[in-house]
């Protein structure tokens, strides 16, 4: 049976995903090492995105994975700020709002559990779908880098936005391990 690291490693061989995530390809050993370091790093938070119907059908967590979403907590001097990322790696899962739902759930988790007050997303300039999604979530463009070919978007957490987030995620299901 394939491991989570092996599946992720396979995804990250895609030049498209490397471009969209600004990632370099890793060896399988490096992938295992990175996943172990993330597991023990208190400044990183990852949710694995599982396609619910596939999981119900197969009972296979790894085979049901379609992507992930991450929070990178900023250094201690700015502990109420985090960078958010989203990746729907499985092509067949794109365009089904999984990224939307997973991002909203991660934002809620960041607000409710971690006390995050400001979120930031760094997105490739040509990733129009992600820029549009974060705009619809109330993020605003704060900078653009032609050198890094990315736009930085931010959202300050306020009561109105937090209420909107909670309304958007009503009925969503988080599976805790």
PLM regions: where:
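Conserved active-site alpha-helix within GNAT-family acetyltransferase domains
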Residues: 100, 114, 125-143
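Conserved acetyl-CoA pyrophosphate-binding loop and the N-cap/start of the following alpha-helix
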Residues: 93, 97-106
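Active-site acidic-Proline motif in GNAT/NAT acetyltransferases
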Residues: 90-96, 125-126
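Conserved GNAT acetyl-CoA-binding A-motif
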Residues: 81, 110-124
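GNAT-family acyltransferases
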Residues: 1-93, 113, 140-177
């Amino acid at each position: 049976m394939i491991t989570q690291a092996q599946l992720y490693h396979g995804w990250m061989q895609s030049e498209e995903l490397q471009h969209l995530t600004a990632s370099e390809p890793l060896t399988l050993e490096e992938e295992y090492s990175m996943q172990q370091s993330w597991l023990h790093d208190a400044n990183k938070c990852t949710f694995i995105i599982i396609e619910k119907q596939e999981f119900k059908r197969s009972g296979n967590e790894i085979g049901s994975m379609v992507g992930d979403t991450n929070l990178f907590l900023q250094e201690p001097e700015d502990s109420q700020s985090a960078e958010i990322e989203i990746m729907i790696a499985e092509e067949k899962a794109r365009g089904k709002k999984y990224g939307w739902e997973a991002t909203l759930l991660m934002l809620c988790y960041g607000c409710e559990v971690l006390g995050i007050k400001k979120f930031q997303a760094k997105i490739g300039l040509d990733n129009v779908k992600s820029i549009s999604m974060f705009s619809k979530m109330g993020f605003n463009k704060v900078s653009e880098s032609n050198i890094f070919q990315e736009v930085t978007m931010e959202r300050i957490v306020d009561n109105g936005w937090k209420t909107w987030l909670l309304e958007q995620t009503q009925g969503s299901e988080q599976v805790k391990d």
